[in-house]
Amino acid sequence: QVAADFLGVSVDAIKIIVGDTDIVKAGGGSHSGRSMRQAGTVIYLGSQDLIEKAKCIAALFFKVDEAEVEFSDGVFSATGLEQILDWFDLARASTTLDLPAKLSGGLTITRENQMDVAVFPNGCAACEVEVDPETGFVKVARYAAVDDVGRVINPLIVDGQAHGSIAQGLGQALWEQCIIDPDSGQPICGSLMDYTLPRADELPMFETALNEVLSPTNPLGIKSGGEGPT
């Protein structure tokens, strides 16, 4: 979605290749609220690099100065010319041009990025519970939360992160226990028959909202989506 937005193409035109070290030589995995913050940032930077390189190639095709080439909504144009090129037109055209060394490889770029500054999402939550005074059984009756995750790229996914992490947090607080036999040292909870996970019928409908305050630590203003509720 990030690449499609910046390159001005449909999401269907973007193919993500993962787990191939011939293409991506280093990666740290998807954890610790880093996917959109780290990958989104390098996709943004790579998109800008690709657009600038593409402008140079388009200038050769149009036979104009690089400064005269403009890019908007996935289309390249030049001042005073009616002809336009989209990404696919330009890719085909680039195979017919005698490209200088700085444009070798055509419409390909490699981009790395190191992020050393931490970001801190934040939020506020309120939970209403009903407690059976005789048994001590706790039922979660209502849960509401407002989270600041920085810029929200995809609200549906962020809501899903919030719901999933709330369920995870409630499960850890109320049901999940890794019990060890004191004599043998063996775990008693060897299966999901003994290790209690939260289920949908034990949880209320979550009331969630987002408060966007952009992070100054990266160009997209990203923080993270799943840390607060957990």
Language model features with spans:
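C-terminal catalytic domains of large/alpha subunits in multi-subunit enzymes
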Residues: 2-230
